[in-house]
């Protein structure tokens, strides 16, 4: 997705959990959550903002829901326009020793694709990718991201800025943070041995 216009930063600041104005100064890709009014996670986003443009990649979430959600609250006074871009390729080096949130992905437009940019990397199989996502605790759409869970329950509390001021879902997030009580918590565990030993 692409947001453009002089109100881009202010609009995203009010719709997501990141401090957009602080991130804009860094000119890098960063993570943010898009929440419901009750503080449940609707989508996990990567955002890169520069000048009056914001590129948005959906890590987990439903694109039409995000488009509808954004467009329903964009008013002429916001001075922002939403566009749907062609899909891109996202390259992320992965390992099991560092959080996926600490690594910097690379976005490549299919029209700018150079063969060596792809061939320098080994592509994971679908099974390897699923195992890595489980180990890393990356929430999946329609599983962990189900309209009921909040970012703290999904291990995403570190990408919520509690000092940034008003944003969608802020009041609910403040309550979750103060209560410290989680109904659920996303965890990963591994077991070794014969399958019969785990009955």
Name each region found by the language model:
Residues 1-199:
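Basic, glycine/lysine-rich polyanion-binding surfaces/domains
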């Amino acid at each position: 997705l692409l947001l453009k216009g002089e109100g881009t930063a202010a609009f995203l600041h009010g719709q997501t959990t990141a401090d957009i104005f602080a991130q804009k100064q860094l000119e890098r890709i960063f993570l943010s959550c898009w929440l419901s009014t009750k503080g449940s996670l609707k989508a996990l986003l990567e955002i890169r903002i520069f000048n009056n443009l914001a590129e948005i990649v959906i890590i987990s979430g439903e694109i039409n829901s995000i488009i509808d959600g954004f467009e329903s609250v964009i008013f002429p006074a916001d001075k922002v326009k939403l566009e749907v871009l062609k899909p891109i390729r996202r390259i992320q080096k992965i390992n099991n020793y560092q959080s996926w949130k600490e690594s910097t992905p690379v976005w490549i437009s299919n029209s700018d694709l150079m063969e060596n940019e792809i061939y320098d990397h080994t592509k994971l199989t679908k099974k390897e990718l699923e195992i890595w996502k489980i180990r890393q605790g990356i929430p999946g759409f329609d599983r962990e991201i189900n309209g009921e869970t909040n970012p703290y329950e999904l291990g995403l509390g570190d990408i919520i800025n509690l000092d940034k001021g008003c944003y969608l879902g802020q009041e609910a997030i403040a309550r979750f943070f103060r209560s410290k009580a989680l109904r659920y918590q996303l965890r990963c565990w591994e077991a070794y041995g014969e399958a019969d030993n785990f009955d």
